[in-house]
Amino acid sequence: MTRQHLWVLLVVAGSLVAGAADGHPLQGFLYGTVETLSKQEYTGVIRWGKEESFWDDHFNSVKENLPYQKYLPEGQRGRRRKLIEIFGKDVDVAWEGDYAARQFVARFGDIVSIEPAGKERADVHLKGGSVERVNGGSNDIGNEITIYDESLGEMKVPWERIDKVTFRSTPSNVDVTARRLSGDVTTVAGEFSGFIQWDSDECLSTDKLDGESEDGKMSIPFGKIRSIAREGAHSRVKLADGRDLTLFGSNDVDESIRGILVEDPRYGRVKIGWKAFEQVTFRESRDTGRAYEDYPAPHEIRGTVRDTDGHVHTGRIAIDLDEAYTWEFLNGSRADIDYLIPLESVRSIEPQRRGSLVVLRGGAQLDLREGKDVSDESDGALIWTRETMKTYLAWDHVQRIDLD
């Protein structure tokens, strides 16, 4: 799909700071330093591949080290290989040895640095000091990185030339000509509001909606669009100037769309499929989301697990023999809507006959029916009741998990 790459203009110190009266509205843009193998450093606003641009965007890969899988009973182990789509990205969830490989998902705001370790590998250094070795699994590994260097302008650095990417707070002396897309999305399950990534891709006012009309092909900047509504297999597009268009013939405007992502503060990130989507109404805003410093250092998950025999186990927890830190995510689905919820936002998980009831710290409740973290596909829970004592519970023996 054709995209505009010249979407950023950096303004160095001494220039006018757009929106300074509003604080620092551009704080949500990715910013950092790219060190190359030739020992050069480039510093500025970053776009990861052609998609991720903000601290709440996700870096996706596959975990190479699975320290908790050894507690899975022998009878539940096996060998499989499967390619699945996670929030618009193809993720290879191959089985390695006897254990299921697991997806790695972290917000860029939780990451200190990323160091390539080969064509398909990288070491991800997280706030708090932990390091995850990841291996392939999505186009976030091995992709080109665009950095808008403060002195040189736009630089496109191939993955194989990168030695290290170090993230840091976005300074107030940068000006970005594009706005971040935000608005309200109406679905069959209600309304979601927040920042929007259309087709799991377009997130800026300068990105374009591609489609065909009766009069020919069109490529419309999102900044000129007021709303998009599903009409069968087509889309009704209303422009800011009041005109209405019917578009078809591309994954931006028909059922082949890869999903509409909404960063809804109530839940985290939701992905809305075509069948659930009804309409999006965009709103103009200079807000770009949380700043890098707004993401605290993560910590281990702790809480209480009650089993079906009435016993209570308190301590450190690994959910699904995988997620054990607050930077990680709980995923589940219902009605063609996928939820990727930061574990720091989860208050409790209660397995049901079908899926789980998930209660969030903000008070929202979700009855999720699909997803490995919330269904009978889960590998269960591991609880460190003492530093040297661990208790494993299969998922069908878990009555409720309450997180501290």
Where are these regions (language model features)?
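Positively charged n-region of N-terminal signal peptides that target proteins for export
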Residues: 1-5
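Bacterial N-terminal signal peptides
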Residues: 7-16
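Compositionally biased alpha-helical segments
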Residues: 22-404
